[in-house]
Amino acid sequence: MSRRKAGRVPRRVDPDTDTDIEMPDLVMDVKPDLDLRSLAQGPWIARDMPISDVKRQLQTASRPLGAPSTCAPRMPLSSKSSDRQPWTDKHPDLLTCGRCGKIFPLGAIIAFMDHKKQGCQLLQVSDPISESKELKALSCLQCGRQYTSPWKLLCHAQWDHGLCIYQTQHLDTPEAPLLGLAEVAAAMSAVAVVAPVESKPPPVSSAARRSPTCDVCKKTLSSFSNLKVHMRSHTGERPYSCDQCSYACAQSSKLNRHKKTHRQLAPGSPSTSASSRGVSPAAPPEPAAYAAAPASTLPSQTVEKAGAAATAGVQEPGAPGSGAQGGPGFVGWGAPAKVERTDPVKIEKTAPRKSHGPGGKCEFCGKSFTNSSNLTVHRRSHTGERPYTCDQCPYACAQSSKLNRHRRTHGLGTGKTVKCPHCLVPFGLQATLDKHLRQKHPEMA
């Protein structure tokens, strides 16, 4: 309610007695009028011209399109490139420390935050931008190919140049000690880190981008991981071993399948019925325990007949055991004991015949088969039975087709063969012999 309606006399404000304390929020900023004469710098405007004439002259004056106005103040452009913000893709966004002036790229924001958390020490450190540009190139000393990651270079040195990075002998044998620092340094001598390369690497041809191929059997695989597993069939490497028996295999899935046999060895299990049919469910051959022995320690007849003191140990990928397994009666490679071999001509007669009757179900894993011969071969992966043996080396397998494929590595056909100078084992390819020398005779190579 106002003072008039309340019956009160409105308070009168005396401008002479009013002070700044009563009206503290009232601030008046009075600017002087713009002197248009100072803007009139053209020769067509006189200095002593009245202001009204100057306004009229400016309104009626016409200037060309795009010409700079004489009334607007012109700001000088900076000649320094650092004072101007670039807007091109060649100059990315940067993060600058306000204390030490260190520059970080926008992608290194984590490093910028760590730099601020450490108190921004005024030290001369390397520039992250220059470090990101100086990418080190990994190149092979033998062929000069460059790679972006150490793993790709290691795979290239292993498959293309035969660099052996795995231990092919069993760990329990005294002839297979762990590699020392000198051996590791000698093995990694083919890998080097070279200086940064200024120019771009040459484009990779289509032949270099082809799928990995096995040097032994010339089989092409889809990836290096599949090639790695496939090479174990030639080298005899069995990195997965059972902790309850001497079973060893090349794939982890086969080891998991083998462990199911130990769970079914209780009385009344299906394994007892398998043993009643003449199949040994839990009697896998002993793993690889042989070592390369000098030719002088072996009898001449044993060397001539066996002829595989340090064979490449070619094995099937799913065979339970290593490449030194020669089936029942195999004492050990390099031992003077006589090893009985199966005549390759009589393989078909001595090998068990395949029955093509109705199939059945596996007692170990429950897998069903429509053909009894396939069930018999599959059951051997659980029992470790390998009736097909090679007469040139301790290789043994569960299928005759795999034995025939293995025999090609020895070059037993009509083609030319090469023999190992130390153990007289024949090979059909020079690459197979070279791999055999590196793995079985490293001190003589």
Swiss-Prot record:
Q: Which GO terms describe its molecular function?
A: sequence-specific double-stranded DNA binding; zinc ion binding
Stretches with biased composition (Basic residues): 1-10
Mind listing the GO biological process terms from this record? negative regulation of transcription by RNA polymerase II; spermatogenesis
Q: Where is this cross-link: Glycyl lysine isopeptide (Lys-Gly) (interchain with G-Cter in SUMO2)?
A: K31
Question: Zn fingers (C2H2-type): where?
Answer: 138-161, 212-234, 240-262, 360-382, 388-410, 418-441
Q: What does this protein do?
A: May be a transcriptional corepressor with KLF4.
Family under the similarity heading: Belongs to the krueppel C2H2-type zinc-finger protein family.
Q: What is this protein called?
A: Zinc finger protein 296
Species assigned in the record: Mus musculus
